[in-house]
């Protein structure tokens, strides 16, 4: 990672996602990271002259936690948040004005996308581009971990478009007045772009690239020390509440406002165990920090990218020579996995975590270190250490987070209470119009008379309904009485018919039965009317009598049936069998 010649390369976000594989590549294929973080033996030509006194710097002790709390505490689904920090920079080699205000990477927090937003994407990155992204992530992790290992495991997961866009953002800087953050900072205003058309039609190259990489909303809110940028893969309408929260969180002169009162609750030990949340002291030098590229505009109108700069590490308190001892450029700590501290691995269970976070775990963390003098770094580090040991950490009071009501589908959220009241009155008037349409007789056109007429009409409908119910009950009673009378008449006729038929059967039918052990001989002589043959067979079946022989003959109207049967489980006497056959064969149909 220490080539002989210094390579200075400008990297621009391409218009098409298909060309993004060249975003990090250089002519030298020896290392992917040459394009992102390079080095050289002679760095004096890359450093600008001594800048004027710097602008007021932000307190980065909890800058990333503020970004995290801003996203996690919002009702909307924001994908990432970036703080662009203002500083006096070097605008270009041909520009003698060294008092140019630059907006460079201060810190960032990547939350990730919702599952439904990922499913909506119809143009995923190609296999080659995805492999390129994973390779860059593995190189970065290998660089951060010092080649100890874990880079291959950390770069196996898929890198989404929004994650790649967030990662590339750390190589960019903006001159005041150019680009989306630069315009917002120059005008001290808020720029809110919502929808693909708004992003695609923007004059800012970064906004157009955000739309290509799947963003639907980009917001830049100017603060005293920089610009807070938020992006989302969903369409989010403008909200004054978010702007107020940004003003409260990033007002560093007043201590950041009520940051502790509603910030996203973090585990107290998380800051020590999670490298993604390490925040450097403003004037201190922490071990394990990695110097990252210096932001440079390079004469671009909108977006400029970093030149390759040497990597300097401060491990275990040791000092490192700086090519320019008078100036220590802004450094960045790039955390791609949890578990790296002082150049060593923390725990084997953290090796397999992805460099790019999912919604459930991890995040991308890029933390910058404020400019400091390299000659006094050891002294300031010891002072910062002593101040850190004497500082009493007071946990912020936990308060419930406000949850506002979201508008229903198809409705836009009102901007203020006046708009909300107007919408409520319009809705009420629409309902009065609907009520007036269904009430037949309206005495007057005012609302009070309309309500009175509606009440009278409802009472009239209730009385009609009760009358209809009573009439229905009366009719049902009459039907029940008639059905009962008809049933009685039918039963009397049937009984009479049965009696007549029974008397005739008793007179006409003759049954003769002879029992020999378990066998019986049966002879029945009767009229052939009403199917006596079928009845005889049915009777034998019901009495469980097995037929050995049967015969049937008809002479005129007389039917003679003979059968030889064998008794089954039950034994019948001659009289019992005769009575049973008489009842079953001679019963009424």
Curated annotation (Swiss-Prot):
GO terms under cellular component: nucleus
Superkingdom, taxonomy of origin: Eukaryota
Region Disordered, residue ranges: 114-133, 291-326, 340-359, 381-422
Tissue spec: Expressed constitutively at low levels. Preferentially expressed in vascular tissues.
Domain bHLH: 412-461
Disruption-associated phenotype: Minor effect on jasmonic acid response and no effect on glucosinolate biosynthesis. Myc2 and myc4 double mutant has an increased insensitivity to jasmonic acid. Myc2, myc3 and myc4 triple mutant has no jasmonate-related defense response, is devoid of glucosinolates and is extremely susceptible to generalist herbivores.
UniProt biased composition (Basic residues): 399-408
Known role: Transcription factor involved in jasmonic acid (JA) gene regulation. With MYC2 and MYC3, controls additively subsets of JA-dependent responses. Can form complexes with all known glucosinolate-related MYBs to regulate glucosinolate biosynthesis. Binds to the G-box (5'-CACGTG-3') of promoters. Activates multiple TIFY/JAZ promoters.
Record text on subunit structure and interactions: Homo- and heterodimer. Interacts with MYB28, MYB29, MYB34, MYB51, MYB76, MYB122, MYC3, AFPH2/NINJA and the JAZ repressors TIFY10A/JAZ1, TIFY10B/JAZ2, TIFY6B/JAZ3, TIFY6A/JAZ4, TIFY11A/JAZ5, TIFY11B/JAZ6, TIFY5B/JAZ7, TIFY5A/JAZ8, TIFY7/JAZ9, TIFY9/JAZ10, TIFY3A/JAZ11 and TIFY3B/JAZ12.
Name recorded for this polypeptide: Transcription factor MYC4
Organism for this UniProt entry: Arabidopsis thaliana
